[in-house]
């Protein structure tokens, strides 16, 4: 998962070094940061339902009803996102490889220690707030998922799940001679 940062301590240290640099450089400079990940990574989780649990000689696969088209960061950057089984949080821990429904490089996590997983369980991928919808695609004509906001214990649908009609709406029919 993401490593937490003491933003106040970091600010003090950077400020001191930056001010020294400006004196050395002989000019005041404006320094700006893009804090997107810091602000929103922890603000969202990604949930996916387990469709199949499959034991092989080398691992136990938990196949989820999603793929890199919804949450590409683990595949694109080989990033780690903690995964919990919210349907069975107190279950016995086992090791799983969590994979998606798209053939190519669709592995959310390999050899992860997760509370025992059964078909229909819901897995939670943590620190996903900055990486799902903004990086999602309609790869292989897959729909984009719904988005739900939870505020003070109440859930609100803030974006509907796509339909095939949503995908086709921007298509133009042309006649070729």
Describe each PLM feature range.
Residues 1-33:
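Acidic, glycine-rich loop-and-beta core segments that form the ion-binding/anion-interacting portion
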Residues 28-177:
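Charged (often Lys/Glu-rich) extended helix/loop segments that serve as interaction or gating elements
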